[in-house]
């Protein structure tokens, strides 16, 4: 299979976008471990239609104008990984889930650690929103782009990462909830 790529700037650093003829195959970080996402030889082609669509959608997302991506995706992984990545796509903008919740969603309630491993191998960062998955108790845990980037993405989506898995409303609603808790 032929893969093409381009590199774009973003508020969370430079991102490498990789596409096949089927769709977007990867969004990786500038300092990403090359063993994390393996696709084969890449050819630079910033004019490829999938890459242009992904770039436009990412710019709109970072500009606060896009909440749901529509660029076609081409996941490469095991069946289990693909089931986890498909579950990521169901997490709405501004909400979070735990690894355990994803495990239950895919019908493997005892597979939280395996879900975490698959989440860590997610080839299409941001668009398949692995940043919306938090550790037990709502902790920010490992993220290929770094915890600062994960925090930035959650904040962009109106989530206060310090609230963990609770308060899944807007930042205003979260602040009101925090105020009510402090008053009682």
What is each residue range found by the language model?
Residues 1-109, 156-184:
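Basic nucleic-acid-binding alpha-helical/helix-turn surface characteristic of O6-alkylguanine DNA
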Residues 110-152:
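Short glycine/serine-rich loop segments
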